[in-house]
């Protein structure tokens, strides 16, 4: 546990920690697993706010995140999609909604992007990876058309 996080309570299957946000170098939170039993390794790690502990599996998008995103008329997904330096060329290389993390070099899943737009009721500014094939662009457009309300604007930008 490090950067802006400090552990303060340990119990079976749980570590509680306090985060004191800073803007200095090496800020944020990191968790490092140093040792585990190979026969029964640590698994299913979740980092959630205490108030979201019992409902996070039902709703990945926390109230704070949605409130923050909801203040904008258009949400640019460049960083959330990992556009800069993205390795994605083909549609099957995008992050899947059911993957164990959305913090991938390929960015968040397009399904999660659509969910954010539906929940906030905002417009989307979507950046296409610079290596994306024509098939990727077509499938992205088809998915967004089918899964985002027609009264939302979707701006598409090639790369950054």
Residue ranges and their predicted role:
Residues 1-160:
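Non-catalytic accessory regions flanking glycosidase/transglycosidase catalytic cores in CAZymes
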């Amino acid at each position: 546990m490090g950067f802006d996080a400090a552990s303060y309570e340990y119990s079976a299957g749980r570590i509680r920690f306090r985060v004191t946000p800073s803007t200095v170098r090496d800020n944020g939170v990191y968790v490092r697993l140093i040792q585990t039993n190979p026969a029964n390794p640590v698994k299913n790690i979740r980092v959630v706010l205490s108030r979201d502990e019992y409902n996070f599996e039902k709703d990945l998008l926390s109230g704070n995140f949605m409130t923050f995103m909801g203040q904008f008329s258009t949400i640019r997904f460049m960083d959330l999609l990992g556009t800069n330096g993205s390795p994605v060329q083909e549609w099957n290389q995008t992050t899947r909604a059911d993957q164990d993390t959305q913090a991938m070099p390929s960015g968040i899943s397009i399904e999660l992007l659509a969910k954010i737009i539906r929940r906030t009721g905002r417009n989307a500014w979507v950046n296409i990876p610079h290596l994306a094939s024509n098939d990727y662009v077509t499938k992205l457009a088809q998915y967004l058309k089918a899964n985002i309300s027609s009264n939302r604007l979707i701006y598409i930008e090639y790369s950054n």
